[in-house]
Structures are given as C-alpha cells and as structure tokens.
Amino acid sequence: MDMNMDGKTVIVAGLGVSGQSMMEVLGSRAGRVLGVDEKKPDADLHSFDQIDWDNTDMVMTSPVFNPRTPFILEAQKRNIPVMSEVELAWQLRVNSNTTGKPAQWIGITGTNGKTSTTEMTSEMLTACGLAAPAVGNIGKAVSHAAVDPANDVLCVELSSFQLHFTYSLELDCAAITNIADDHLDWHGGIENYAADKAKVFHNVKKALVYNADDERVTKLAFAAQTAPECRRIGFTLAEPKDGQIGVKDGWIVDMSGIAGGEAGKPFQVAKVTDFTHLTEPDGTVYPHLLADALTALALVLGLGADKDKALAALKQFTPGGHRIQTVAVAKTSDGGTIRFVDDSKATNAHAAKASLNSFADKSVVWIAGGLAKGSRFEQLVADQARTIKAAIIIGKDQQPMLDAFKASAPDIPMSIIDPTDNDTVMARAIDAAGTYAQSGDVVLMAPACASMDQFKSYADRGNQFAQQAQRWVNEHGEA
C-alpha cells in the first residue's frame, strides 16, 4: 500500500483516542487532514455526508465503525483505501534510537486476556531494560508510539476491530489468547471474527504463541504462514507436550526450549505458587490469569529477553482493576465471609465462564447482563449452572440472558433488576444479591455483556459495584 501522503487529503473517521492521535501524526505528513465526528464540536466535519469523496485519497477509521457502515462502503466503492490506526502506525514506523531499526512489535489479540497479557509483557520487557510501552486497544495510541524513536519494543493489544482494516503487519512475536463468540454483530459471524484475529500470525518472525487448549486457535496457528526461523509455542494449563509451555505438579514447565532447556524435554521454569499476583486472599490461583502469564512469558522469552529479569518482574506484577478482584468482604455470624468480586471486564460469555469456573459449586450469586452484542448464553448457563446459586439480571438487553436461564437452568433463583433507572441499578442489584448470599458465598459481577447501556464503561460499572458492595457491607455489619 502506497503511504506517500504528500499533497493528499486524508479523512479520519472518529475522534476518540486513536482518532486524535492519527490527526496529530498525520498533521505533518499529509497535505490535508479532516476529522469527522458527529459528537465532537471541534471536528472539521460533523456528518459523513459532508465528505468530498472526489477529493479524498485515504480514510482512517475508528474501531467503532463496522465494515457495513455506509461511509466505508462508499470509500471502498470508489477504491479509496480504508485502514485502521494500527495499519497507519505500522506503515509510519521510525527507527529506534537504540538499534537504528524500527522498534520490534509484539501483537496480542484474543477474545479475552489481551489486556493482562499485554501489561505483563510490557512490564517484563521494561524490567529487562527495554523501552517497551503497552499500547493499542489498551488505551494508549499506537500511532504516536510508532513514530517515537525512544521505543525499543511496542507491546500492542490488538482488537478484532483494529485488525479488520489492517493489511500488512509482520510482527516479531504474536499471540492469540483464545477465540470465542464476541462482537459477532460487528463482524457478521464467528468465521469473519476468527479470520481478523488470525492476521496477527501472518509472517511472524520470531515467536508465534497460541492457546493449545483452544482448538480454533491451534488450527489458525498451524495454518499460518510464518518466517522460516519463527517458532510456534503452545501454552496450556495442562501438562505440556513438545513445543509447549504449561503446568505440571505445581510447576510451570517448558517443553519448547525457549526457557533455557532442551526442546522436547521438560524444564522447570518457576513454581506456580511464586505468582502471588494471580491469587486471591485465600491463595486461589485463577486459571485464566495463569494462562495470561504463560502467554506473556512465552512472548518475552520468544523475543529473546533475559529470563531471570522477566520472571522477577512477572512475580511482582499486579493485574489492572476490574479483573476478578475482591472489592468488599462481609463477615458472617458463623465466622465466615461473603466476598464481593468485581470482574466487570468479563464482557462476553467466554470471560464470564473463566470467572465462574474459579469458584466452588453453588457458591456464586452472579450479577449478569448488559449489552449482549448478538451473543447467546444458553451454553454458558448450562456449563456453569453447578456454580451458580442465584442470578441477578441487570442491563437493558435482558432477554438473551433470561432465555438462557429458562432453557438451561430454570430452577436457579433469579432477580430481575428494572432497567429504567440507570442511577440506582447497581445499588438495587447489590441489595438483591444480598438476599441470596450466605457464609462462604461470592457475589460475582462478571456480566458476560458490554456496559454502555447503563454505565460509561466497564470501569464505571466496576467502580459502582465496588461502591455499592462496600455500602452493603457497612449497612449490614455481620451478615
């Protein structure tokens, strides 16, 4: 793709974090840059109908716009290139001050686990003395990072939205954490969704890291065309096979050779109990966070970083907020507790399943619901019915979750929170949960849905959960 922008007119669609960054990066590189955003007063254009297509050379699009959006279809009909911020960043890479070559890129995608894995990867590489910021879908614009010569490595969280309009990535290391139904309304189906995720594996140079416990990801990994020297490294929560890193007898064990041992022979890397950042107060290690750590470790060692420094950083890493985090604890009269756990970042069924799987049978009062994004939940409820003691249904799009319980677990008690008052929804949900919770139980908010119907973001939803949980604990004293 020709990225010579001299004298060209570029449209930037959507002026959020990535859009604003593209406007700034393109300002000194293109002939004319016009931002389009219906909600931003300072946008150059406030309607896509205002675009002068006859004098437009390129379109940079925000992830919010799906491929069937009219302005995208119009651009494609006119053979005007449409690309993501990630594609722009890749095309505009500058040489690093350290090496005189473009910064290495590590790309991380998947339905769940992207953010934690990206953060872990960044922290380990930073501990190894590299300038390795976490950028991309994680909230920090990749286009600014790509044109900053101070960076040695970019740890890029990549969403399927970003990858759809990305064409030429050839990453140094790449990982797909897992693939499950999500954003199907945007992509038009699971096959399109998986195909966009698979773009990270194309022509990977050093290490292709895949979830060996996920059949779809494994197939994509072995179907991918890579550089001849690239190693395929599977991660698993079971005993690893040749070419994998996994868990055996309380140890992280490498069978791929990336950790210093011989490929095909077990090499003990670290004790699982070393990873206190992955545990709750009772010492429980959450399996999905351990999987994220294995992914990040494989990426970092696959890049060639120092193992000891990387492990030291990983052992001290603390996950970000709203990821299966205990936010309040009520003491009960029998000396036990009721825990309130915020996993607001579990915005799809796959993430909610991982969260529910972390707890004992019939111990979870589950707060679920929100924007379903075209997903169905029958299988999730069927699989996790053994764990769920009661369900509290929030959100404006309640029917998919209600249908799932009716079909898969009709005997589980349920409270439905009236969606008409957004300001009190979480308070009412917590109060309802409190009527079911007893000693030893967990009130878990892992909604399996997006948050924007009733909250500003998943973080806002999590913060409100924490506030209302603490309010309930304060009001009830000993439950």
Curated annotation (Swiss-Prot):
One of its GO terms (cellular component) is cytoplasm. ATP binds at residues 110-116. Pfam families: Mur_ligase_C, Mur_ligase_M. Cell wall formation. Catalyzes the addition of glutamate to the nucleotide precursor UDP-N-acetylmuramoyl-L-alanine (UMA). Gene3D superfamilies: Mur ligase, C-terminal domain, Mur-like, catalytic domain, NAD(P)-binding Rossmann-like Domain. PANTHER family: UDP-N-ACETYLMURAMOYLALANINE--D-GLUTAMATE LIGASE (PTHR43692:SF1). It comes from Bifidobacterium adolescentis (strain ATCC 15703 / DSM 20083 / NCTC 11814 / E194a). HAMAP family: MurD. One of its GO terms (molecular function) is ATP binding. GO terms for biological process: cell division; cell wall organization; peptidoglycan biosynthetic process; regulation of cell shape. It catalyses: UDP-N-acetyl-alpha-D-muramoyl-L-alanine + D-glutamate + ATP = UDP-N-acetyl-alpha-D-muramoyl-L-alanyl-D-glutamate + ADP + phosphate + H(+). Its EC number is 6.3.2.9. This is UDP-N-acetylmuramoylalanine--D-glutamate ligase. It is found in: Cytoplasm. Its main location: cytoplasm. It comes from the Bacteria. Belongs to the MurCDEF family. It is an enzyme of class 6 (ligase). Pathway: Cell wall biogenesis; peptidoglycan biosynthesis. Keywords: ATP-binding, Cell cycle, Cell division, Cell shape, Cell wall biogenesis/degradation, Cytoplasm, Ligase, Nucleotide-binding, Peptidoglycan synthesis.
